[in-house]
Amino acid sequence: RYGVDACPHSWHNILMGLANGHAVAALPNGRVLELCMIQGPLQWDMLAERPPTEDGHLIIGKRAGLAAELAQDVEGRFPYIDGGYALTVQR
């Protein structure tokens, strides 16, 4: 409407990245999706398979929903931790 491109930042896990990727693909002004590549194991290891990419582009799957399947025992490998999950760096 205003000629501004949409460029969401997906700074958490790959499920959020896939959801944002679908949004960017559906938007007429969707330009790019930025993913945090240093998130840690939760970023990719929560899925049974990594989503396909080609030349740095996320390939949106054709299956229903987010076109992804959770890995086995995700809740066992990544249990809920009460409180914050940030690390404090002492200088």
Positions of predicted regions on the chain:
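Extended hydrophobic packing segments that form well-structured cores
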Residues: 65-91
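Shared catalytic-loop signature of beta/alpha-barrel
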Residues: 1-65, 69
